């Protein structure tokens, strides 16, 4: 009697799943929905960092699991986007990237013996222009930030400082992704 429920606060993201999928529109900042049965698996890819208080949310998710339940998590963490931060600093502008949780702040909320897997991977994307790397982030709302947005002229100024890292004159955008498998 197990099934997969796809949960998101974005109707656009929910609508990307098959019509046959079980889906629920839900704002995870309000906590998890009240389900008739406690979940045996919570899987989250690039969601937790959008939420207010990701650490508190992770602790709630852990506490909501059934006995022997698991959380599988992929989340960008602090240390992501060094190129963006470098360009902003050199352009004397505020980096408007979303502030991400630290590796330690996430694992601190779960007992160490319950962490089955904990690894950080650096993923580097390259393109001819930084805008090609940033536009897909904007498409999924990843440009959201607590910082005041830059004007178009400020963006142009920032992009002129984006570091070029290879002989092909390509630019990069690097992500630090934490992968966690947690068992209750």
Where are these regions (language model features)?
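A short glycine-rich, Lys/Arg-flanked "PGG" loop and its adjoining helix->strand segment in the class I
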Residues: 55-70
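Structured loop/turn residues at beta-strand edges in well-structured enzyme cores
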Residues: 19, 37, 42, 173
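Short conserved AdoMet
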Residues: 18, 52, 66, 111
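N-terminal regions of ATP-driven nucleic-acid and macromolecular assemblies
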Residues: 9, 15-20, 101-103, 172, ...
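A short SAM/SAH-binding and catalytic strip from SAM-dependent methyltransferases
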Residues: 40-55, 75
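Conserved Class I S-adenosyl-L-methionine
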Residues: 116-184
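Conserved catalytic/acceptor-binding region of the Class I
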Residues: 68-130, 143-153
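Class I SAM-dependent methyltransferase SAM/SAH-binding core
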Residues: 1-35, 56
